[in-house]
A protein has these predicted regions:
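Single conserved hydrophobic/aromatic residue that forms the stacking wall/gate
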Residues: 1-7, 11
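A broadly conserved detector of short glycine/acidic/proline-rich loop/turn motifs that flank catalytic sites
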Residues: 80, 125, 183-184, 216-219, ...
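Conserved P-loop NTPase mechanochemical-coupling segment
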Residues: 16-95
Length: 236
């Protein structure tokens, strides 16, 4: 019915007799564009097949994540995927974690979720920057984790090179900030306006492994240093 109505409106407009279309209607061209985008993302792709070959160590992402327990670490590599596929994978993972914390899988055997689940995202400025489109699926999922995840025991841990490029709703909901060495151009942005000039100068001179921690429980920034490995490392 939507398609027929939209087609009729297009025809009337072409004939010069059409009336102004309701803003809630979706044109035929929009439907076709949506279909092309979906088909391009999932058609003839092994990631969307209806079977998982256990002999090749394949598994359903949701089936693996919902069996997470204490001290488990799951690594999902999306670097080689396109942006559309990255959105599918990230959305599926976060939605499974939410359903797990909401008790959607309590009736299944072997389900024993930990009290807290930490979602670590490397290069956060790639997925949740200020330049990311407003309706980006990955950005919406990240914002959902930062704004609602804390009440469910889901914590976002992000790592990025430039804090000033991160979306304001992400940094605004972070309780703890860890600052590593950076340049004076970065510290001159308004994201660092709350830091005293003394700490800004320290950020430009920090050594490798040194960080400044900012948390409401500390009256001032706390400097920490990661210990060196207890074993000798050889560089090629």
């Amino acid at each position: 019915p939507i398609k027929s109505s939209a087609t009729s409106d297009v025809y009337k407009r072409q004939q010069g007799r059409g009336t102004q279309r309701n803003s809630n209607e979706i044109s035929v061209l929009s439907w076709r564009k949506f279909k092309r985008i979906v088909n391009k993302a999932i058609k003839n792709d092994d990631m969307f097949t209806n079977r998982a070959d256990s002999s090749r160590h394949e598994c359903r992402l949701a089936d693996a994540i919902k069996h997470i327990s204490n001290n488990d670490v799951y690594v999902i590599d999306v670097a080689k995927l396109t942006e559309d596929k990255q959105a599918f994978v990230f959305g599926d993972a976060v939605r499974t974690i939410y359903n797990l914390k909401l008790g959607e899988y309590d009736g299944e055997s072997g389900i024993n979720p930990p009290s807290r689940i930490i979602v670590f995202i490397d290069e956060l400025n790639k997925y949740a920057s200020k330049d990311t489109p407003k309706y980006s699926p990955i950005l919406q999922e990240i914002l959902d984790v930062t704004e609602r995840g804390r009440s469910l025991g889901v914590v976002l841990f992000g790592a990025e090179q430039f804090r000033s490029n991160i979306h304001q709703r992400v940094t605004g909901n972070c309780s703890t900030h860890a600052y590593g060495r950076t340049n004076s151009i970065e510290t001159s942005t308004k994201d660092y306006s709350s830091l005293p000039s003394t700490y800004k100068n320290m950020l430009t001179r920090l050594e490798q492994g040194d960080y400044l921690i900012q948390n409401p429980i500390f009256r001032s920034l706390l400097k920490i240093r990661f210990p060196k490995p207890i074993y000798k490392q050889f560089k090629k």
